[in-house]
């Protein structure tokens, strides 16, 4: 096995900084790749939380003026991850999350902030750190999308490049005037460069210039080549279809392990699901639901948004109530959806419970105690909650899109091999019909237990997924040597 060195570039990395699924991937993949002979180091910005955790990091480069202020490149490690940190206080030492202010407004200089990250990634690719010269630079999402562009326009020997799309909806769009401020040539403002409907797009830059493009499920890789799914970039992705592949995400099975999970009331394993009923009782109590073994308890852990289909679930509430089901929802997002769910809970005490926000303990308890987990997304690049549900014996009810299509086996298609229920088209009526079907199956205890056991037997770890990435890296390295 030929060793490979890969520099990953990500704006967030779990367990250091997390706002979404990107962080989970960036935190889990490097560790899983070690078994495949891949040495991965991850470059991330020096946000306040990062600097606190890596207070003993080694300084390996200092700049008196890096994109408008002093900066340093640090090397350190945390929780099994080997890290490079770009410490540029005037860009990253701020309150709020990595992308927005405490009021939820995008930082006005986000273009410069993440161009700086990509610039140093390209420099590491060129040998800035002699002890680690990567074979490949792997950029994650728009925040790292300029790394392949810088490497292209530097016009010198370079490593291979991979661009991963975690969500096409986030494209890093800015005014063209930014080009002059971030050190790219004006020739890059071209339809075959960064130009995007009169502005520039960091995501487009990555898709245009990366040697290989991946996204987080095979179905999503097909969907984003359409005009609708590509959200303005479908034509480019069709043109680059030969470089595009879909590799499913996994989950950290050490964190999501019902046998050792300290967040749940009663631990259990695949061979004995008895304690799931005890967790269900605790979950009902936490969400002020009626205590009942016979009422199917539906769980939801989601951002409340149009993309996630949470408006469709609201329309299906009469079906939930009519079928004698319960609903426990944990999430936040669109203010109107929050208000409507809270109103539904007030109108149906004991049947619908809602907690606005995110709570890690409650998220684990929902997986361990709900009978089914609903993921009704209009589009879903991969999805992680349904993978956790399989791991915990909560039967997924999902829409037929993206990674949901790829990770759940529908009861109507596979019988005894099934792991859940899928519905399409993505409408409230289709969801309601599938909820009725799930309710019927729930009351057939043998059928339901088979669904749970099939889910628990499904490999949702990063083990096989990491092998796919390792094969991609080696294929790219070999093609560049040829």
Swiss-Prot record:
Keywords of the record: Glycogen biosynthesis, Glycosyltransferase, Transferase
Chain sites annotated for binding ADP-alpha-D-glucose: 18
One Gene Ontology CC term in the entry: cytosol
Signal sequence annotation: none
UniProt GO molecular function: alpha-1,4-glucan glucosyltransferase (ADP-glucose donor) activity; alpha-1,4-glucan glucosyltransferase (UDP-glucose donor) activity
UniProt-listed InterPro entries: Glyco_trans_1 (IPR001296), GS/SS (IPR011835), Starch_synth_cat_dom (IPR013534)
Keyword set includes Transport: no
GO biological process: glycogen biosynthetic process
Presence of the UniProt keyword Transmembrane in the record: no
Annotated metabolic or biological route of this protein: Glycan biosynthesis; glycogen biosynthesis
Task of the protein: Synthesizes alpha-1,4-glucan chains using ADP-glucose.
NCBIfam families attached to this UniProt entry: glgA, PRK00654.1-2, PRK14099.1
Family of this protein: Belongs to the glycosyltransferase 1 family. Bacterial/plant glycogen synthase subfamily.
Name of the protein in its database record: Glycogen synthase 2
């Amino acid at each position: 096995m030929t060793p490979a060195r890969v520099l990953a570039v990500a704006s967030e990395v779990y367990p250091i900084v997390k706002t979404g699924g990107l962080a989970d991937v960036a935190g889990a993949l490097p560790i899983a790749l070690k078994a495949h002979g891949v040495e991965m180091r991850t470059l991330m910005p020096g946000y306040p939380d990062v600097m606190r955790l890596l207070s003993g990091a080694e300084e390996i480069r200092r700049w008196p003026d890096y994109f408008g202020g002093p900066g340093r490149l640090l090397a350190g490690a945390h929780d099994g991850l080997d890290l490079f940190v770009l410490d540029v206080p005037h860009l990253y030492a701020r309150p709020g999350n990595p992308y927005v202010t405490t009021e939820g407004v995008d930082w006005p200089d986000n273009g410069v902030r993440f161009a700086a990250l990509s610039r140093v990634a390209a420099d590491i690719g060129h040998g800035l750190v002699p002890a680690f010269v990567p074979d490949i630079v792997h950029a994650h999402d728009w925040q790292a999308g300029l790394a392949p562009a810088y490497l292209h326009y530097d016009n010198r020997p370079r490593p291979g490049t991979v661009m991963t799309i975690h969500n096409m909806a986030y494209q890093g769009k800015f005014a063209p005037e930014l080009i002059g401020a971030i050190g790219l040539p004006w020739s890059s403002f071209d339809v075959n460069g960064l130009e995007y409907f009169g502005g520039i797009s960091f995501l487009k830059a990555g898709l245009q210039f990366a040697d290989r493009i991946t996204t987080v499920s095979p179905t999503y890789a097909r969907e984003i080549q359409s005009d609708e799914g590509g959200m303005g970039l479908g034509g480019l992705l069709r043109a680059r279809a030969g470089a595009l592949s879909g590799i499913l995400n996994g989950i950290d099975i050490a964190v999501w392990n019902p046998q050792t999970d300290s967040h749940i009331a009663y631990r259990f394993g695949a061979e004995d699901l008895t304690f799931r009923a005890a967790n269900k009782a605790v979950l009902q109590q936490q969400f002020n639901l009626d205590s009942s073994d016979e009422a199917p308890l539906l769980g939801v852990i989601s951002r409340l948004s149009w993309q996630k289909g949470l408006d469709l679930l609201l329309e299906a509430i009469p079906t939930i109530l009519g079928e004698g089901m319960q609903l426990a929802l944990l999430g936040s997002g669109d203010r109107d959806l929050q208000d409507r769910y809270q109103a539904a809970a007030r109108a149906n005490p004991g049947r619908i419970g809602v907690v606005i926000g995110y709570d890690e303990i409650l998220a684990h308890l929902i997986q361990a105690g709900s009978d089914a987990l609903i993921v009704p997304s209009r589009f879903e690049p991969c999805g992680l909650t349904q993978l956790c549900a399989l791991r915990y014996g909560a039967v997924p009810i999902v829409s037929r899109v993206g990674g949901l299509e790829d990770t759940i086996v529908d009861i109507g298609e596979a019988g005894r091999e099934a792991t859940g229920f899928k519905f399409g088209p993505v409408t409230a009526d289709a969801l309601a019909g599938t909820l009725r079907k799930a309710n019927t199956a729930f009351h057939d205890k043998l059928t339901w237990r088979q669904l749970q056991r099939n889910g628990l037997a499904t490999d949702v770890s990063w083990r096989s997924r990491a092998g796919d990435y390792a094969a991609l890296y080696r294929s790219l390295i070999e093609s560049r040597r040829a």
